Every structure is written in structure tokens, then in C-alpha cells.
Amino acid sequence: MAGGHRLLLENARQVVLVCARGERFLTRDALRSLEVLEGASLVVGTDGFIKAIGPADAIQKQFSEETFEERIDCSGKCILPGLVDAHTHPVWAGERVHEFAMKLAGATYMDIHQAGGGINFTVERTRQASEEELYSSFQQRLGCMMRAGTTLVECKSGYGLNLETELKMLRVIERARQELDIGISATYCGAHSVPKGKTASEAADDIIKNHLPRLKELGRNGEIHVDNIDVFCEKDVFDLDSTRRILQSGKDIGLQINFHGDELHPMKAAELGVELGAQAISHLEEVSDEGIAAMASARCSAVLLPTTAYMLRLKQPRARKMLDEGVIVALGSDFNPNAYCFSMPMVMHLACVNMRMSMPEALAAATINAAYALGKSHTQGSLEVGKQGDLIIINSPRWEHLIYQFGGHHELIDYVIAKGKVIYKK
């Protein structure tokens, strides 16, 4: 019996499925060659989920009596899953372009931080900004990410450090989640820095006694939806004990643990994350061998951020060792005032050049594995029947051009589609 569907993508040169057997993540040998169909078509239903993928002639025959709200001829082009950005700080006021000049002159991240710059500078301006001002700039930033192919993005609070401003940021994120087409995973990051006038232990007490109970209440009322809890576990910021207390308290109210660890100093944050059952740990430039082995065994995702290592001139995360040992490696842009990058294609390119990842490894890390880091790989991160119709169409006969063409994604990306709806067309 004939029926209606939302979208038919016809005659693509390549359809990059990434996965084809319902995998929730890819490691080791599964990353050597991703699942790719040649000369294929794809159907998205009116519910926004993929209904069929296969050879173009077979799809044409199967759906010859069906109607579609939209058809797109993909001849000579490639269809890929929408990209997933597993780590961003996109809600803030007060740019820090002046600090870039300081870094170029030799100042370190912690030099700037201890001089009252860095996070502290942004916190002051974010506290002063209205909710509407924050939403306006956030919406523009999400638009830039979406035009670069991102269809699911993790969004952190963390430039408030007091309950009032953290909730203001989370309301901004919730509004975007409700109103915009891009997918959002919301993260409470009230432990991004220790507020002036408090010790790490005092800040942790405030978060545990005041912030988290309020988040639980607002979540129960349906006012704010938060998925993850984050802490900046670092020397002279939050030590292991404070980090453990905050993360465990967040887990106790149902939040996934997804935190900053082992970035500037070896803290044994990876080992702590595994102990607490973390879904993901980000940065990991200074992770220990034991931490890598523990993360691999626990299926705890490593969210690597090549932009940060590049811009701060840090040593690169040991992606190659993590991949070889079976860690679930994901990628994020770390978009923030200190690492101003919207583009996951650029992140993938940097991962390949600076972290020695292959192009299939980088694409998996920016799709299925990034979705896994956010607890979303059952619905997003690959092109499979039953998953959300989140995808991009690039004007190239080979998918690798999305990574190969450094900085050229605006010329490549013809369409960005979320749940079968075209949200960007060049």
C-alpha cells in the first residue's frame, strides 16, 4: 500500500553508513574501513527516522508507489552521518581575542588564568549579560556549527560559577533545545573553575548542597533538561577529592559523568572516571598508561580536542596509543573563547595530521563514537534503518574530501539535514 515519506535522497555516489550492524561504538579493527555503499539511495520517514538504505535501483523499485515531501538528487555526491561535536562551551559573553595575542607572546593558559583572565574574564561578562543577549549569541554560534555539518552538539554551562548564572546558562541551552533543529546534549559545568573567595572544597560543598538539588528540582518539573555533569579536574582548580564528590553527587541525581581530566597535569583523572563509571572524559593530554588501559576496559570514551592542544601549544593527546589499546575515541571542537572553532571537519583534519589518526578513525570519532560519549549512539551517529535522519550531503565523489580539504567545508557541504528536515542548503 502506498504511503508518504519525508525525504528521498537518490543516486548518491557514496553513502557512508559508518556502522551497519547496530554497533554503539567502533574500536580497533572496526575503524580500519567504515561501511560505505556505492550508488545508493536513502529514505527518511515523516517521523524523522531512516526507513531504508540500499542500492539506488532497489530503493527506486521498492518505493515506486510512495510519495515524498522532498526528493534530492545526490548524483556524484556523498551522504554522511551528521557530525557530532562531543565537547563545547558555547554560551558566554565577552570575547578574549586579546588573550590570543598574550598566548602568542608566550603566556600559558594558567598564567592568564591566575592573572584574572581566561575563565574569570568570561565569568564576569557572562554574569552581567541578560538571558536574551546570551541566547542571541548562542543561537548564532549553533548556526555556524550546523553549517559546518554538526547535527548534535554537547553544550556546557560553566561561566557562571554561582547558582543564578549557571541556571541562566542552562535556561538558554534548554530554550535552544526546544526551539532549534540542531540536537543538544546539555551539561552542567558549575565546577569549571573555583570562584573567587572560595576554596575548591568550599566550591564543591556549594555545588553539592545548593546547585545540584536545584537542578534535580527543575528537572523533575520539566523546566530544565540536563544530561551530563562536568568538573575541571586540574592542579590548582578542582583536586581529585573535590572532583569525586561533585561527580558522584551528580551521578546520584541521574546525570552522566562527562568531565575534563588530565589536561595540563597528570592527575589520575582517567582512573577516577573509570572508578565512578564515567561515560566520557575529555582532554587527556597527560593521561597515564594505566588510565588508558582502565578506560579501554571500562568502555569509557576519550573525547580528544585537537583544537585545544593546537591553540595552547600543548603536547597532543596520545590518540594512537588509545586507539591501539581499544579506547573508544571521540572528537570535539572544545569551542569556547579560548579555542574559537565551530568546524568539526577542521577538527577531524587536525586529528589526522597532529594526532596521527586515519580518516576513517577521525570520521568515526566525530560520528558514532562522539554520539556514544553523549549516550546517544542508539539513535544518532550512523546511517542505519531506525536511526534519526541526521545527515549531510557533500559535493564530492569521495567522502574523504570532508577531512582532506582543510578549511574548505563551506564549499563542500550542500545540505545539512536533521530528522529528515533540511536545516541548511547552500
Swiss-Prot record:
Binds 1 zinc or iron ion per subunit. Disulfide bonds: none annotated. Pfam families: Amidohydro_1. SUPFAM superfamilies: Composite domain of metallo-dependent hydrolases (SSF51338), Metallo-dependent hydrolases (SSF51556). Keywords: Histidine metabolism, Hydrolase, Iron, Metal-binding, Zinc. Fe(3+) binds at H260, D334. Pathway: Amino-acid degradation; L-histidine degradation into L-glutamate; N-formimidoyl-L-glutamate from L-histidine: step 3/3. It is an enzyme of class 3 (hydrolase). The keyword Hydrolase applies. It comes from the Eukaryota. Its EC number is 3.5.2.7. PANTHER family: IMIDAZOLONEPROPIONASE, IMIDAZOLONEPROPIONASE-RELATED. Belongs to the metallo-dependent hydrolases superfamily. HutI family. This is Probable imidazolonepropionase. It comes from Bos taurus. The gene is AMDHD1.
